[in-house]
């Protein structure tokens, strides 16, 4: 079965994984598939690209809208990596990163819990039949209406970093357990630092614990976030050390024993994850080895989402200025590529020349030109790529962007009437080679 790809569009993700049972699938894949009943067909190892081409061929007859492909095989592989590297840390996937329902479903089937930041995100998760006790409401500053909703539906674990939040929770959800969100010592290498906005300073920890104690609220533990996409695994070392100090302060105040440590997010896949896992385990052993009953959770988003999604866009316009080629595509910085601005992402494009070069759609060996790629809106800021090398392409050819799962569609807008939320996601399962 290795090297094959199963392709399906619009099916229950668990049904897709059903065909992995008995075919060398990992235990994670098998567990995710146990309730699946619908048949899927295995295809050749190149079928993922073939699948995209088949979708494009269908779209040649209609409006040629952009689309995503979600590779569930990649998600299974990433979950296996997580459980192998961090077996004692429960992932609570950060829904804000990418709330695609099929993606949430497959993560749930593989045992992930969920980090939600709003009522809407809680509703996304509950709508999939997921129990509220698998949700942490990990937003330190919540509208009162959202706290009331959390109490109503039974989401009973949340974060705080201010006295005002204590008062809101005491008033509207006194049964909720709290995690004190602290500011990490260092998050300077994160793509998106969290420290300037969230997290208690060292001198604020004791007053915030006392405030919760006076309000007769239960502080079950500590949370932190080193920042989204942090490349420096050493950031976890200082943050975990600071968390231990909070545990000790709570004990000195006579508070109930803390039982939860939330090490937040910041994880990326690949070699950086390996380094982060080593750093986290080392720090936990050093600081919390005397806490055998401690529950440790994390809030990975990018780790699971980024590499699992591929975006396909149509070339809708072209201009030639000497050697320079300029193309307009039907998604851009106000849509999925908002990650270039807000997430400091670097995007890469590969061609599928279905209109101009059908005998060599990937344009292998073709001459390339300095290229600018614009998004579809009227704003000149909407420029996806500059000084990028691409072959000669034409209107109705396609550009494909890999690694487009993290903070893309989730943060897109409908500016100029280009509706990011309407972009369709197709499902595939590519077995690891």
From Swiss-Prot:
Top-rank lineage group of the source organism: Eukaryota
Name the chemical reaction catalysed here: L-ornithine + H(+) = putrescine + CO2
> What triggers or suppresses the expression of this protein?
Induced by wounding.
**Is this entry keyworded Transit peptide?**
yes
Q: Which InterPro entries does UniProt cross-reference here?
A: Ala_racemase/Decarboxylase_C (IPR009006), De-COase2_C (IPR022643), De-COase2_CS (IPR022657), De-COase2_N (IPR022644), De-COase2_pyr-phos_BS (IPR022653), Orn/DAP/Arg_de-COase (IPR000183), Orn_de-COase (IPR002433), PLP-binding_barrel (IPR029066)
Gene disruption: observed consequences: Reduced nicotine but increased anatabine contents; these phenotypes are enhanced upon treatment with jasmonic acid (MeJA) and wounding (e.g. removal of apices).
Q: Which residues form the active site?
A: 378 (proton donor)
Its Gene Ontology biological processes? alkaloid metabolic process; nicotine biosynthetic process; putrescine biosynthetic process from arginine, via ornithine; response to jasmonic acid; response to wounding
Question: Pfam families per the record?
Answer: Orn_Arg_deC_N, Orn_DAP_Arg_deC
Q: What is its EC number?
A: 4.1.1.17
Binding, pyridoxal 5'-phosphate: 228, 266, 299-302, 407
Q: Which cofactor does it need?
A: pyridoxal 5'-phosphate
The UniProt GO MF terms for this protein read: ornithine decarboxylase activity
Q: Where in the cell is it found?
A: Plastid, Chloroplast
Q: Which UniProt keywords apply?
A: Alkaloid metabolism, Chloroplast, Lyase, Plastid, Pyridoxal phosphate, Transit peptide
Q: Site: Stacks against the aromatic ring of pyridoxal phosphate and stabilizes reaction intermediates. Where? A: 225
Among its keywords, does the record have Plastid?
yes
Looking up PANTHER family in the UniProt record yields:
ARGININE/DIAMINOPIMELATE/ORNITHINE DECARBOXYLASE, ORNITHINE DECARBOXYLASE 1-RELATED
Functional summary from the UniProt entry: Involved in the biosynthesis of pyridine alkaloid natural products, leading mainly to the production of anabasine, anatabine, nicotine and nornicotine, effective deterrents against herbivores with antiparasitic and pesticide properties (neurotoxins); nornicotine serves as the precursor in the synthesis of the carcinogen compound N'-nitrosonornicotine (NNN). Catalyzes the first and rate-limiting step of polyamine biosynthesis that converts ornithine into putrescine, which is the precursor for the polyamines, spermidine and spermine.
Family membership: Belongs to the Orn/Lys/Arg decarboxylase class-II family.
Query: What does the record note on quaternary structure?
Result: Homodimer. Only the dimer is catalytically active, as the active sites are constructed of residues from both monomers.
What protein am I looking at?
Ornithine decarboxylase, chloroplastic
Recorded name of the encoding gene: ODC
